[in-house]
Design a protein with these regions (language model features):
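Non-catalytic cap/lid and distal C-terminal segments of serine-dependent acyl enzymes
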Residues: 1-241
């Protein structure tokens, strides 16, 4: 089909939220053939950028091009990606209402405007560095919404102490635990803080996938592992969709 050769489309938009002082800006990646297959519905992956970056971070790493290629060859089921912008990137929760805005406002807007599969099994959240903090913070507090979360080179928020995260984990029924993927570079300057969360998951006997690779806390590292990330998120999503 010719539409697979054209690649996907990225749309920029914004919405108002009572949880934020300014509009929430976001980008949406629509996979190849989205317009040409109006009967089809898609899983959604929410991806959050690193601190001091903008919501084109994952796109600049090559996320859209990679999904274009893998979906066109049939190696991966196509899916939507949503990239929200954490404008107040030096403020952590609960003072920063970014997480609440995603859950209360952005997800309903995406499910209304686009042809999504609005079930937790077809929705995942992940992030790089600070963005991974948000993925943990949002994903563990809303296991009814997300079936998977990824934390890439992620030191936890100082406000999300071990007892607080442990409470979230203990409150999740076993059948509602999201799939969890974590990774970091051996020379990551924040590695000791990433290991805090990884150690907690081990202490709580929470199933998760953990990788420690050569590399630093930088774009070269994340770009080198981008395909692994996206394949992991999409692994439960089949072409039957």
């Amino acid at each position: 089909m010719a539409c697979w050769e054209k690649g996907g489309q990225v749309i920029e938009s914004q919405l108002e939220s009572e949880y934020l002082k300014k509009p929430l800006e976001y980008r949406v990646y629509l996979p190849p053939c989205y317009a040409e297959q109006p009967e089809r519905r898609y899983p959604v992956l929410y991806l959050i950028h690193g601190q001091t970056y903008r919501n084109d971070h994952w796109l600049n790493l090559g996320a859209a091009d990679l999904v274009d290629r893998l979906a066109a060859t049939g190696e991966m089921a196509p899916f939507l990606m949503v990239f929200p912008y954490d404008r107040d990137h030096y403020i952590s929760p609960p003072e920063n209402g970014f997480g609440e805005a995603i859950v209360a406002d952005l997800i309903p807007a995406i499910d209304t405007e686009f042809r999504t599969l609005p079930e937790r099994a077809d929705r995942a959240i992940g992030g790089i560095s600070r963005g991974g903090n948000w993925a943990v913070h949002i994903g563990l507090q809303h296991p009814e919404i997300f079936g998977a979360l990824g934390a890439h080179s992620t030191p936890i928020f100082s406000s999300d102490t071990n007892p607080e995260i442990a409470k979230w984990l203990e409150a999740i029924p076993l059948e509602r635990l999201p799939r969890i993927f974590m990774d970091a570079g051996e020379n990551d300057r924040w590695l000791q803080y990433t290991l805090i969360f990884e150690d907690l998951l081990n202490t709580e006997n929470i199933p998760h996938e953990w990788h420690l690779y050569p590399g630093y806390h930088d774009d070269d590292y994340w770009q080198a592992h981008l395909e692994e990330y996206l394949r992991w998120y999409a692994s439960p999503w089949r072409e039957s969709h």
